[in-house]
């Protein structure tokens, strides 16, 4: 009960062996993102910045994070390519905290993300 936190951390089992994380990063980078999917991500970013419902939109850097996360999601699903559904699945975690409603209504991030997904057509 009174264990030192460092001792507790030292007793945690290792989940990854040396080099496995690098292998996972490389595998994630190898997941294919097609041109239509890139257009979809760009449309999401553009709508968040230019659409009537948002005061603060998503930056190009947010788009890069969205693509990296969607690649990882696809890899975890056992695929070598990203689907629009992968982008939609990770969008709340990647972008929810970055979006602000234009009318300053304090909407939950999940609702703002839903608005964005509903406003942009799937490829």
What are these regions (language model features)?
Residues 48-123:
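C-terminal engagement/docking regions of AAA+ P-loop ATPases
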Residues 1-43:
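Conserved AAA+ ATPase core "coupling" helix
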């Amino acid at each position: 009960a009174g264990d030192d936190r460092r001792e507790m951390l030292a007793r945690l089992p290792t989940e990854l062996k040396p080099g496995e994380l690098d292998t996972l990063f490389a595998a994630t980078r190898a997941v294919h993102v097609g041109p239509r999917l890139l257009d979809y991500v760009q449309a999401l970013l553009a709508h968040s910045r230019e659409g009537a419902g948002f005061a603060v939109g998503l930056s190009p850097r947010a788009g890069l994070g969205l693509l990296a996360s969607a690649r990882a999601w696809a890899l975890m699903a056992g695929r070598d390519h990203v689907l629009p559904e992968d982008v939609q699945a990770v969008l709340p975690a990647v972008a929810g905290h970055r979006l602000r409603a234009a009318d300053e209504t304090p909407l939950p991030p999940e609702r703002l993300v839903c608005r964005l997904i509903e406003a942009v057509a799937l490829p």
